[in-house]
Amino acid sequence: MDCRGLLCGMGNTGSMTSADELNEQYDADGSVTQVPERNDEVHAGESAVAQSRESAVTIPAGTVVLAATPIGNVGDASARLVALLERADIVAAEDTRRLYDLARRLGVYVNGRVIAYHDHNERDKADGLLDQVETGATVLVVSDAGMPTINDPGLAIVRRAIERGLPVTCAPGPSAVLDALALSGLPTDRFCYEGFLPRKHSERVQYLRTLLPERRTIVFYETPHRIADSMDDLLD
């Protein structure tokens, strides 16, 4: 097909990682070597830097905060995300198990109340969370990976917060859409995001044909087990 499209494969970024795995690094040839232990002075210095960085992060009271989480690389977690995980009153997580896995890898203790907040319950839970915001609570919303609301939960609470006149902000970070776009080599001055393609071949082909007149760069999401078929359809 003639339309200029970019497929972004969405894999499982929430796998469990052991302490030993976190203490390994990959050489250029793909082999694994052990990271040398750092001395106490280095650890103390890093701890002081971390404390200074945390004190510089303001946690807004009475606010909904959408925070981006790492996509496969825990090193992409921002200082704001770390502080929010530690200090938010309520953490609304797409998958609580993955949240605690992320917190463990970051060395963070989640002090606030954690609730499951996903596609199947976000509309029902939005107003209850916003009632807490009205009392001054900081409600942190996180998805499994990337930015909430981008094919992830979060839209319902943002809409209701706007309707109720309550503040919403975000702690920016990784987003698969923008990462894929930046690395594609395709024009980025004008683009559109089309989310996931239809699962069935016939529906996918029909949908792609409607996009033929589109001259902007198009970004799609696709699952690993369907990405080859979708690429074939794009090339037809």
Please give the residue ranges for each predicted region.
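Short glycine-rich anion-binding loops that position phosphate/pyrophosphate groups of nucleotides
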Residues: 71-72, 144-148, 224-226
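Short beta-strand scaffold positions
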Residues: 93-94, 152, 221
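Glycine-rich, flexible N-terminal cofactor/catalytic loop recognition
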Residues: 9, 17-19, 23-118
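Short glycine-cluster motifs
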Residues: 134-194
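Conserved helicase motor
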Residues: 117-122, 197
